[in-house]
Amino acid sequence: YQGKNEVVLYLSGKLNINGVDIDGLIIKEDAIVLVEFKNYAGEIKAQANGDWFHGSERINGGAKKKDGSTKTVFEQLKINRRALRDGLSRYIKNEDACNNIQALVVFSSISSLKLDEEFKWGANAWVNVSDVEHICEELDTIKARTRSNKSIILTDGDIFDFIRSKGLDERYIITKYSDTNVMPGDLFHEEFAHNGDDFSPNVLL
């Protein structure tokens, strides 16, 4: 994203990981980030125990429970995070990064945010909330750490090896938003077909 020299991989579209659909995945030098988009604007209340709210309206997490009710946003995030961890561990050998995946829930716009204290520190501090306008600023603050407070470090090589192992060739690159100059020669050939300004096709992980 703008002003950053690090390599950042962003996969968009409908991603299916171990049977679970997620909206996006970001891999950067200090975190793997699960991205979920919510089409709500205004006052947002996000909490670890209980429902999330848009004003007085409950925000559904997505999947249904056995009793027919839908999971909370946080419950769904935990499910998706576990699925992502298990799915990525076959391709990314950095165990600390896979075991400490972060989440970023992005709303259309937020006029006020009441964020549970549990999301600010402690075991659930992996949950982050932003809106579309401030997504880059929030992403910059997301830095994964282990339980022993060790920083997560993913090298450019880790990211490029993931691209290779998943076979993400030119067809998947949106060149309008990508700096293809940083890519190794075996991963991008300008003369081959690529997406250009279009959205990339779905990726099955």
Residue locations for each model-derived region?
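Surface-exposed interaction regions that form or flank ligand-binding interfaces
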Residues: 1-21, 26-33, 38-48, 53-205
